[in-house]
């Protein structure tokens, strides 16, 4: 946790990026994450809706105030495209990347995970995705990112760091 908890407040300060505001999957993913992570030491800096869109996620994230952006230690996204939009923002601004988590099983996310730039993504499997996102956050909180080899939970892929 110490490596990720930059401000040493004992919590991971995160931004949650949802899909469409009234979309069933976005509601379910967000509700599931919030319910399953309630016992984790997390602090929500903001919740944005980006309609599953990379460019919109970039735009909405860039509209957060500078303090929220600089305080962000993790970004949890309802899909990989929105996670990549946040990644694009950090890269364009030459900022250190926070922990970024997505959902979907996209090839580009796989490449970013393998390069070590993005922490992880989980399979678009309704039964398991929320629990796996929470498990990823637990590993981050416990400082087990090096030991936690399987960072991409997705059928047919299971990407592991060597």
Where is each model-derived feature located?
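Acidic, glycine-anchored loop motifs typical of Ca2+
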Residues: 6, 10-12
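Conserved acidic residues
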Residues: 12, 73, 119
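Hinge/cleft segment of the Venus flytrap/periplasmic-binding protein
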Residues: 10, 17-21, 36, 125-162
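Hydrophobic alpha-helical
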Residues: 33, 45-46, 50-111
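Short beta-strand elements at the ligand-binding edges of bilobed clamshell
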Residues: 1-2, 16, 47, 115-127
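Ligand-binding cleft/hinge of the Venus flytrap
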Residues: 29-42
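Non-catalytic structural scaffold of enzyme domains
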Residues: 1-3, 109-110
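Short beta-strand->loop
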Residues: 15-24, 48-51
């Amino acid at each position: 946790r110490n490596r990720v908890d930059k401000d040493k407040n004992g919590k991971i300060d995160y931004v949650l990026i949802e899909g469409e505001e009234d979309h069933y999957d976005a509601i379910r993913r967000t509700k599931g994450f919030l319910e399953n992570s309630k016992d984790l030491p997390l602090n929500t800096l903001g919740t944005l809706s980006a309609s599953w869109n990379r460019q919109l996620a970039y735009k909405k994230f860039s509209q957060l105030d500078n303090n929220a952006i600089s305080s962000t230690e993790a970004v949890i996204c309802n899909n990989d495209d929105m996670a990549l939009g946040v990644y694009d923002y950090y890269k364009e601004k030459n900022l250190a990347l926070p922990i970024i988590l997505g959902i979907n099983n996209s090839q580009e996310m796989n490449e970013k995970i393998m390069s070590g730039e993005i922490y992880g993504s989980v399979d678009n499997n309704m039964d398991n995705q929320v629990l796996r996102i929470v498990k990823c956050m637990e590993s981050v909180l416990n400082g087990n990112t090096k030991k936690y080899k399987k960072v991409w939970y997705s059928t047919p892929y299971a990407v592991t760091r060597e």
